[in-house]
Design a protein with these regions (language model features):
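Compact, glycine/acidic-enriched structural inserts
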Residues: 152-203
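Short, positively charged and aromatic/hydrophobic N-terminal segments
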Residues: 14-16, 23-26, 32, 37-38
């Protein structure tokens, strides 16, 4: 998944918002008080890491300039550390059902916070989200992986393959066309369809050229990407069981990734 976000990001996909008060603490045992000041605390709340990240992201959305960022670098460092600790735990939990990701480090899955503004009319220097793409093949691979995204008012778990070259996209469509019932059994199952009711973010209007017009599941080959998105409420990542619930979502996603990645492996 890529480094830019458009409600979802790059060859990836995205997540989160939460409210917290003066009594919250971060993962290092630092308490957050009015005015974004940090003081030592003896107690750590279960949801403190996501809350800390989201508060900083709300702040940077309002003050997206270098002067403010440098004045509040301590807050950024604390939020970044909190996010990275969440990513490390998520990698370990995904490894239970997808051992291929076990050798990934946090740095293999996360992105720079600084935006590339060279070709964008928006010259804001910093992103407004934290995202992690957990992909055994790497962040820039065509193969799909698991995406975890924290962003105020844009909360989701997602995954799949995004921005595929035309020949690779055609290979995935061809695989779906050759194994329609197998693919439908995955994405049409109750657990998957409940979490991910739509496959792909964008679609062509009709069945692509070269594919049968009478294909029984035309919506599966009209996809311009093979990704899936699961929006969640702000309370999801501030709950004590966010890790277990995230792993459950990604485990349901895995057969879809396996199918798509098998087609991509043959094409690249």
């Amino acid at each position: 998944m890529g480094d830019s976000v458009k409600r979802r990001g790059g060859n990836a996909v995205i997540l989160i918002f939460a409210e917290w008060g003066a009594g919250m603490v971060n993962s290092t045992g630092m308490s957050i008080f009015a005015g974004n000041k940090y003081r030592p605390s003896m107690k750590q709340a279960d949801d403190s890491r996501a809350a800390l990240c989201l508060q900083f992201l709300r702040d940077i959305a309002v003050h997206n300039n270098r002067e403010w960022f440098h004045e509040h670098r301590e807050e950024y460092d604390a939020a970044r550390a909190a996010f990275e600790s969440m990513v490390a735990e998520l990698i370990a939990r995904i490894t239970v059902f997808d051992p291929a990701v076990q050798y990934l480090g946090v740095g293999d899955c996360t992105y720079r916070f600084y935006r590339d503004t060279r070709f964008s009319p928006d010259k804001s220097p910093y992103k407004r989200h934290f995202g992690a793409y957990i992909n055994a093949k790497g962040k820039k691979a065509f193969q799909g992986g698991y995406y975890f995204h924290l962003e105020p008012e844009n909360c989701m778990l997602a995954g799949g393959s995004y921005c595929l070259p035309s020949d690779v996209l055609r290979a995935v469509r061809q695989s779906v066309c050759e194994q329609p019932e197998e693919f439908h059994a995955i994405v049409g199952s109750d657990p998957f369809h409940t979490l991910f009711p739509v496959i792909g973010e964008t679609h062509v209007k009709t069945v692509p050229k070269g594919f049968p017009k009478d294909f029984p599941y035309p919506e599966y080959i009209r996809c311009k990407d093979y990704s899936c998105f699961h929006p969640v409420p702000e309370s999801f990542f501030t709950s004590a069981d966010w890790l277990e619930r995230s792993a459950e979502v990604f485990q349901v996603m895995k057969p879809f990734l396996d199918f798509v990645n098998a087609a991509i492996d043959e094409a690249v």
